[in-house]
Structure formats: C-alpha cells, structure tokens
C-alpha cells in the first residue's frame, strides 16, 4: 500500500524540500519511532490535546481512501522533552477501524502511539512524506496551540500511513521550533546528542513494510522486558 494523494495537492513530497536544513531533512526521514528518537534527547511526556470523532482534513481523506465527510477517530498530542514541546502530532483512523482493528488507540491516554505501532509484527508502514506548513493548514493551527508564538512559514511536518489487517491509521507529526533550537545547541556544543553523529534509516521512498523489525533499539528492549 502507498499513500494516495489528490493530484492537485503537490505539497506533500517523498523527498524533503531542498531548501530545508540538514537537521530538518534528517528528522523528516528518520525511520522507526519518533518518540524513541526524542527520548535520546531527554525525558518525553505525552499530553493529549484532543481525542474523539471528527471529519478528516482535506488532505487526509484521499490518502486514506475515504469519502470527504466519512467520520474518523482523531487523536492529537503534544510530545514534550524535559517539559518543552518538541512535536505536535495528529493521528487519524477510519471510525470503524478505531472500534475494531485499531481500537487500542482509544485506550492509550498518555502513552505514546508508538507502543502500538512498533511492537506488532502485523503492522506495516508506508513511505514517509513531508512538507512545509503555512498558517492555512490545520496542523499549523494545532502546533500554534502547543506554544506561545510561531514565526510564519517556519514549520515542517511529516506523515505516513500504518496498516494493520488492511485498516489504515495515518500519523502526521509537526516538528516545533524548540526541537531545532535544541539540536542546534547540542550540535554547537559537540554533545552526544548531535543529530549528525547518529546515522538513521531513511524511510522516504520506501515501500510499505513491517514496523516491528524496524523499531528503535530502545523500543525493542522495552518491549522484550514487558514480555
């Protein structure tokens, strides 16, 4: 399965925009769990900002193969590292799937969605796509609620579709300015968190494949301990 897009919407790209920074290109194409990558920077907390039934965004329904006004289950969270918001995430699944194949997403509360996506061998993931966000996009407005102020046209986001037993779940992640500021500080100090010091598997342009084998090592170790 691949993400299906409306031909008129050319904003989402398989390869990151050439004008983005090296750090942005790196984080937009990292495979595995984003939560696990954030944990390498510090303690991660999940704050749920919205959860319930809604309508898909204009650039979501076609990608999920849904009718424009088909109801979906939405989960929106902010991922904070050491108390500072680094990522605003928006996940959406067909309403029927959220009560069936993906029903566990309704019970996560403040646990990360990665717990479902990277410990189940029946879950597969599409390639990653990314784009720059403007104030007109609903994800930009979601990000604005997570922090006090946003510079115009300063946000980038990525998305992919996870599939389990034929049911899709789309995850869109918007990186916030504090993430780039932190990476720049760590990189400038030559610390162990330097983004360039840790090569990662790149997911853009890859076909759908199972996620359990691609989980971050820390995630796999945690899963094994729970067993």
From Swiss-Prot:
Gene: ubiC
GO cellular component: a single term: cytosol
Record-listed substrate binding positions: 75, 113, 173
Organism from which the protein derives: Paraburkholderia xenovorans (strain LB400)
Keyword Lyase: yes
EC number: 4.1.3.40
Family (UniProt): Belongs to the UbiC family.
Annotated keywords: Cytoplasm, Lyase, Pyruvate, Ubiquinone biosynthesis
Reaction catalysed by this enzyme: chorismate = 4-hydroxybenzoate + pyruvate
Region (Disordered) location: 192-227
Full protein name: Probable chorismate pyruvate-lyase
Compartments where located: Cytoplasm
């Amino acid at each position: 399965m691949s993400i299906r897009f409306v031909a008129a919407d050319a904003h989402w790209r398989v390869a990151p925009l050439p004008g983005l920074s090296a750090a942005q290109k790196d984080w937009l194409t990292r495979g595995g769990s984003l939560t696990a990558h954030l944990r390498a920077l510090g303690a991660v907390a999940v704050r749920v900002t919205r959860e319930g039934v809604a309508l898909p965004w204009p650039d979501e329904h076609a990608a999920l193969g849904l009718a424009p006004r088909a109801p979906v289950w939405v989960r929106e969270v902010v991922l904070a590292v050491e108390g500072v918001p680094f990522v605003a995430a928006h996940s959406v699944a067909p309403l029927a799937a959220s009560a069936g194949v993906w029903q566990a997403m309704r019970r996560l509360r403040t646990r990360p969605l990665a717990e479902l996506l990277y410990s189940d061998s029946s879950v597969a993931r599409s390639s990653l796509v990314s784009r720059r966000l403007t104030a007109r996009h609903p994800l930009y407005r979601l990000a604005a609620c997570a922090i006090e102020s946003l510079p115009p046209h300063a946000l980038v986001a990525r998305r992919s579709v996870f599939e389990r037993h034929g049911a899709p779940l789309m995850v869109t992640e918007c990186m916030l300015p504090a993430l780039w500021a932190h990476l720049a500080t760590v990189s400038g100090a030559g610390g162990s968190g330097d983004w360039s010091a840790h090569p990662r598997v790149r997911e853009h342009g890859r076909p759908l494949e199972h996620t359990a084998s691609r989980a971050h090592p820390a995630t796999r170790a945690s899963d094994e301990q729970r067993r």
